[in-house]
Structure formats: C-alpha cells, structure tokens
Amino acid sequence: RVSDNPVWVNGFHRWMLGLSAQWMQFHPDTNNANRANSINRANSVAPLLVSSRQGLGKSTFCRLLMPDALKAYYTESYDLSSPASAEAKLAAYGLINLDEFDKLSASKMPLLKNLMQASALNIRKAYKRSASALPRIASFIGTSNREDLLVDRTGSRRFLCVSLEHAIDCTTPVEYEQLYAQLKAE
C-alpha cells in the first residue's frame, strides 16, 4: 500500500511485529516464553511517511492500522511540553501518530527519543503518593510534508522513513483478523 522499496517492506513488517508484541506482552493469553522475550523491549523505531504533496493518505493510513474495536487506543494528540503526560500516554494508547512530525521542535527530540526507547514506566497518578509500574503498550508512527525533517547529526536510527511516490490505497479494507493473527503467529 505504501511502498515497494524492500527496506521499507522489511522494516515496516518488523515494526508491525514489534507493535503487536508490545500489545500482547501483558495479555493473559500470551504464553510465558513470548512474554519473557518482549517484556524488556520497547518498539523504539517509528515509521515516518513523508511527501511534500498533501492528500496522499498518510494520516488516513496511520488511522487504518487500528481496527474499529481499538480506535480508542489511537491518538494524534501527543504533546511533548509535558513529559509526565507524554509518558503516561505510552501506557494509555496502542498507537501514537506523530502527525506533522516536522512541527516538533529540535529541543524536544531528546525527550522523544528517550520516550521511544522507554520500556519500563513508573507513573504517579493524580492524588497518589507513589508511582505505579505500568506496561508500555504504545508504538509510534509519523507523517510529514517535509523531506528535510531529520537533521540530527548523531543519526536517526529510530526513524524508518519512506518517501511516498504515489497515493496510498486507503479504500481497500484491511483484513484485521488475518493481519493480527499472522503477526501473533510470527
């Protein structure tokens, strides 16, 4: 749907495996062997769909990754000006779309990178004295209309960028049961 580039196809597949593993790591149906392998890892890579042309379906594609039953666990609202709130969303959402990724300020990139690799969350809820350990279930994806969005001299290994050459097919229905069953089996 997005690109035939082998680097994208392989990288996006691995990211989807990480996304589904993160969702299942604390699920009661997950066997202990799989849980042990995934519990200390975070899906620390984020695909970025990039095109200077608007209307290619970047944001729509991101929304389509979530089946209707899980739409409440998808957000495009992610504010890095409040680190505690940003961290709490890692336990509250399954997929966070960094829509218009290029609008994030360079000063917020270290915080974003730290949050992307965080696997253990200790969050203090309002009116509580101590923090609670919560599972990290969120994965990140992003979109941008600018091709020059990654300017970090230390590298950008956390982002899998694809430059769109055509509109994304967002009209063909996603077979969610088949998609997520296959990811779970892998």
Predicted region positions:
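P-loop NTPase catalytic core of nucleic-acid-dependent motor ATPases
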Residues: R1-A91
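Feature primarily recognizes SF3-like P-loop helicase cores of small DNA viruses
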Residues: P28, N37, A42-V45, A72-S77, ...
